């Protein structure tokens, strides 16, 4: 563990030292104009941003679902050794975790249907509408992906507690299940916000 901490600390220090040296050199030699965020945003294609949003929506949602299933499943299997009756009933927690991935897939399909081809290649000809659409799709994908990531972890931890509590006292299952339902609503909040972000998106010529 100490070796990993030293490795990560060394990488962290080296990264910031390199960044500091480059920044000082660019400042001394008056080359600061090369750090141009506006140039990067206008020279990249709106399709890149929309596809990044689609990829983030699916990948982060699947990571959240897998993480939640891992946390819940290990507790169900461990508690099922002592109390085999909990194995079937606590599969509800697995279903809640899997729903998180479904939210991401649905939102990725919605975003991909909004992407329309356009013929322009010059940044001025592409227009603000297409850039706005690309950035909005990226933001929507990031929103739903991160919310589903944390939703999956939340549902997994609560589901793990529900399985262990049910193994000890069956009357606690329904009470903890209510907490799990509220935890799974976090993913729905992300989907709703992502839909609002892309509600006025128009792409194409």
Swiss-Prot record:
Keyword check for Zinc:
no
The record's Gene3D superfamilies line, in alphabetical order, gives: lithium bound rotor ring of v- atpase (1.20.120.610)
Localization terms from the record: Cytoplasmic vesicle, Clathrin-coated vesicle membrane
Q: Which domain of life is it from?
A: Eukaryota
Q: Which residues cross the membrane?
A: 4-24, 52-72, 91-111, 138-158, 176-196
Query: Which UniProt keywords are listed?
Result: Cytoplasmic vesicle, Hydrogen ion transport, Ion transport, Membrane, Transmembrane, Transmembrane helix, Transport
- InterPro entries listed in its UniProt record: ATPase_proteolipid_c-like_dom, ATPase_proteolipid_csu, F/V-ATP_Csub_sf
Q: How does it sit in the membrane?
A: Multi-pass membrane protein
Enumerate the residues marked as the site Essential for proton translocation. 98
Give the tissue specificity.
Expressed in brain (at protein level).
Chain ranges on the Lumenal side, renumbered to this chain: 1-3, 73-90, 159-175
Q: Which residues lie on this side of the membrane: Cytoplasmic?
A: 25-51, 112-137, 197-205
Q: Which GO terms describe its biological process?
A: pH reduction; proton transmembrane transport
Mention any Pfam family matching this sequence. Answer: ATP-synt_C
- Tell me one GO molecular function of this protein: proton-transporting ATPase activity, rotational mechanism
Q: Name one GO cellular component term.
A: membrane
Main function: Proton-conducting pore forming subunit of the V0 complex of vacuolar(H+)-ATPase (V-ATPase), a multisubunit enzyme composed of a peripheral complex (V1) that hydrolyzes ATP and a membrane integral complex (V0) that translocates protons. V-ATPase is responsible for acidifying and maintaining the pH of intracellular compartments and in some cell types, is targeted to the plasma membrane, where it is responsible for acidifying the extracellular environment.
**Membership in a protein family:** Belongs to the V-ATPase proteolipid subunit family.
Assembly description: V-ATPase is a heteromultimeric enzyme made up of two complexes: the ATP-hydrolytic V1 complex and the proton translocation V0 complex. The V1 complex consists of three catalytic AB heterodimers that form a heterohexamer, three peripheral stalks each consisting of EG heterodimers, one central rotor including subunits D and F, and the regulatory subunits C and H. The proton translocation complex V0 consists of the proton transport subunit a, a ring of proteolipid subunits c9c'', rotary subunit d, subunits e and f, and the accessory subunits ATP6AP1/Ac45 and ATP6AP2/PRR. Interacts with IFITM3.
Would you tell me the protein name for this molecule?
A: V-type proton ATPase 21 kDa proteolipid subunit c''
Please name the source species: Bos taurus (Bovine)
């Amino acid at each position: 563990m100490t070796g990993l901490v030293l490795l990560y600390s060394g990488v962290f220090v080296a990264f910031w030292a390199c960044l500091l040296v480059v920044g000082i050199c660019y400042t001394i030699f008056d080359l600061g104009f090369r750090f141009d965020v506006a140039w990067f945003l206008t020279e990249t294609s709106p399709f890149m941003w929309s596809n990044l949003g689609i990829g983030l929506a699916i990948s982060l949602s699947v990571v959240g679902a897998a993480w939640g299933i891992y946390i819940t499943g290990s507790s169900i299997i461990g508690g099922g050794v002592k109390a085999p009756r909990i194995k079937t009933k606590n599969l509800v927690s697995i279903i809640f975790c899997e729903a998180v991935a479904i939210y991401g897939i649905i939102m990725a399909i919605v975003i991909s249907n909004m992407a329309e081809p356009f013929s322009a290649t010059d940044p001025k000809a592409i227009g603000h509408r297409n850039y706005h659409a690309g950035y909005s799709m990226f933001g929507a994908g990031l929103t739903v992906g991160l919310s589903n990531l944390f939703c999956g972890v939340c549902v997994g931890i609560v589901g793990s507690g529900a399985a262990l509590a049910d193994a000890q006292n069956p009357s606690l299952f329904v009470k903890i299940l209510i907490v799990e339902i509220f935890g799974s609503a976090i993913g729905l909040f992300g989907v709703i916000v992502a839909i609002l972000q892309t509600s006025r998106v128009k792409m194409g010529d």
